[in-house]
Amino acid sequence: MYCLQWLLPVLLIPKPLNPALWFNHSMFMGFYLLSFLLERKPCTICALVFLAALFLICYSCWGNCFLYHCHDSPLPDSAHDPSIVGT
């Protein structure tokens, strides 16, 4: 389970509030995970545990899934603040 210490913090990285950055964030996270899996070659158990955790987070629509945004989950209140989102 040594390799999980490098995979589990990836699930804690928050998604940006600005919807324009969601695509860039998901591409970065996808390429990071792909390069990690190709370079470090984690054991099968660690990879399955991580993929199960990723599936459960995305399936529950908590809003922290970096693969897509659930349309049922509302944006946080701070996402509508012009001082945070920008112009």
Swiss-Prot record:
Subcellular location: Cytoplasm; Nucleus; Membrane
Keywords associated with the record: Cytoplasm, Membrane, Nucleus, Transmembrane, Transmembrane helix, Tumor suppressor
SMART domains: BC10
KW Kinase (keyword) present: no
Membrane topology recorded in Swiss-Prot or TrEMBL: Multi-pass membrane protein
Segments passing through the bilayer: 19-39, 43-63
Cellular component per GO, a single term: cytoplasm
Record's keyword annotation contains Calcium: no
Pfam families: BC10
InterPro entries per the UniProt record, alphabetical: BCALP
Family of the protein in this entry: Belongs to the BLCAP family.
Function recorded in the entry: Acts as a tumor suppressor; induces growth arrest at G(1)/S checkpoint and apoptosis via RB1-dependent and p53/TP53- and NF-kappa-B-independent mechanisms. Modulates expression of genes involved in the regulation of proliferation, cell cycle and apoptosis.
Name of the molecule in the record: Apoptosis inducing factor BLCAP
